[in-house]
């Protein structure tokens, strides 16, 4: 007990109730902390360092216990910069892992790895929190049925369908429409599935995170007037953060998504941009903790770390988390341990093509490079499978003929090949689609196309029933009826010009 000098009444020191340690060593973002005998914190416990530095600036650093070294010493990794910390400073063991706010209060807000809002919009309701370290759902809780997650985007639903509760790799360079595709998926899941989305920015540029936030506000995905009506929560741990924050920010985003799945029983989209940076941060932390590196300098625990994240992303009987993960491939080497370990968990890949983007075909999803384990007759049905295969065959034949066309021209092709080229060009244009989130930029109203409508449209093109329509009628339309209506309008316009 100690006495408060202003009231002379006895008050209990809050520090006396806490498990206190002291900093023994600081090496970059890694701290060694000594605790009293018998008072050692558990692995993954959060430690708080609070105080003032030599110039009187307030310090508030949270660390996570990674190793128990013996002699009452633990090694922890800081979640923020360790500037100003000194040996001998007091460290408080919180007695639990990092916990972050979850639920509806998180929608429309930006958080850091600790679940603190960083968007200057005031505090967040923290009555409901959840620890970021949790076990994956037990096998008995899983929903093991194969079911398609309809996105309303023609090229995705037809050629590389997403699995409900699956994991999708999103491959694409800068400026090919990755962000717009992500925002459209967020918009469509909210409208068609009544679901919400969580975006985890892992180790990417701060500017990109800010741009995404601004574009989401412009497109209405984040509702500025009524934040509670927003469709997405954002969690950022960007490039300038210490490796501990970048390694854990994916778990923070996943924890928020799990609450929507397990408690609200919703379908959730979880975006991770970029999953490679999660591995990279783990590699940095592993080296700082003194572990022996494995192949290509990666951490020896690479598969375990990846599995602990990916196995929590799944469908249960309550709801589902469908994850779309941007994958950076270092030096375009698909055999690098980081992307190779990621591929083992993916159900589908969506590859964005710069060639298609240059032609103005949006979304610029490559129909030949994008794949899905769901595209099997027993899962999607014979009709869907046959249509998708014929679309791919026609597109592949057109690709093979392009060199001949460039050198000799269309006239040198056989009648059959000319017909194939004409249909392939219609298919290529029909794979484009106006997006709801791009309305403010293009002026064209967005279109959600159901799977049955998508299949019917491509079957009509492949059957030759629409051979007489001009190919520009198929560009940036929703279903096939819009294409035929557009063809009639084009015909009327051309007659009026004459």
From Swiss-Prot:
It is a peripheral membrane protein. It is found in: Plastid, Chloroplast thylakoid membrane. GO terms for molecular function: ATP binding; ATP hydrolysis activity; proton-transporting ATP synthase activity, rotational mechanism. Keywords: ATP synthesis, ATP-binding, CF(1), Chloroplast, Hydrogen ion transport, Ion transport, Membrane, Nucleotide-binding, Plastid, Thylakoid, Translocase, Transport. Its EC number is 7.1.2.2. Disulfide bonds: none annotated. SMART domains: AAA. ATP binds at residues 172-179. It holds the Pfam family ATP-synt_VA_C. Gene3D superfamilies: 2.40.10.170, Bovine Mitochondrial F1-atpase, Atp Synthase Beta Chain, Chain D, domain 3, P-loop containing nucleotide triphosphate hydrolases. The keyword Thylakoid applies. One of its GO terms (biological process) is proton motive force-driven mitochondrial ATP synthesis. Its main location: plastid. One of its GO terms (cellular component) is proton-transporting ATP synthase complex. The keyword Cell inner membrane does not apply. NCBIfam families: atpD (TIGR01039). HAMAP family: ATP_synth_beta_bact. Belongs to the ATPase alpha/beta chains family. Produces ATP from ADP in the presence of a proton gradient across the membrane. The catalytic sites are hosted primarily by the beta subunits. This is ATP synthase subunit beta, chloroplastic. The lineage of its organism: Eukaryota, Viridiplantae, Streptophyta, Embryophyta, Tracheophyta.
